[in-house]
């Protein structure tokens, strides 16, 4: 068996040969992509998917015939670029607004009140002036000896 230290490798350049056991990354199988020594499985698969996205976007055919539209960091279509998507509360504007008829109204009202209390709690933490009041729902109770110590425990 040949080894690197023996110098018995038959390659074009012994310095650049990397044995398969020392190659970085997972060497999985992508049917349409050939594996090279310098690329990891993640880089090869990302390149494969990006090439597919680019060919679909540049063609005049429907993108739904081969799998659809995928969000990516590099694309010809600005709507598919991940950085273009909204990151704030605006992302809920396009969510469906329908409601089911078998809703537990008491539970939904309880969740709405909890959401309001959570917003007030966030405002309390963001407030640097100390004018926002603390929400009593989120105050963690402590044991009585911690808040009112006995005179013997103070010393």
Swiss-Prot record:
Q: Which UniProt keywords apply?
A: Cell projection, Cytoplasm, Cytoskeleton
Where is it mostly found?
cytoplasm
Q: Name one GO cellular component term.
A: axonemal microtubule
Location in or out of the cell:
Cytoplasm, Cytoskeleton, Cilium axoneme
Question: Do you know which Pfam families this protein is assigned to?
Answer: CMI2B-like (PF10629)
Q: Look up the domain of life of the source.
A: Eukaryota
What family is this? Belongs to the CIMIP2 family.
What is known about what this protein does? Microtubule inner protein (MIP) part of the dynein-decorated doublet microtubules (DMTs) in cilia axoneme, which is required for motile cilia beating.
| Protein known as | Ciliary microtubule inner protein 2C
Q: What taxonomic lineage is listed for the species of origin?
A: Eukaryota, Metazoa, Chordata, Craniata, Vertebrata
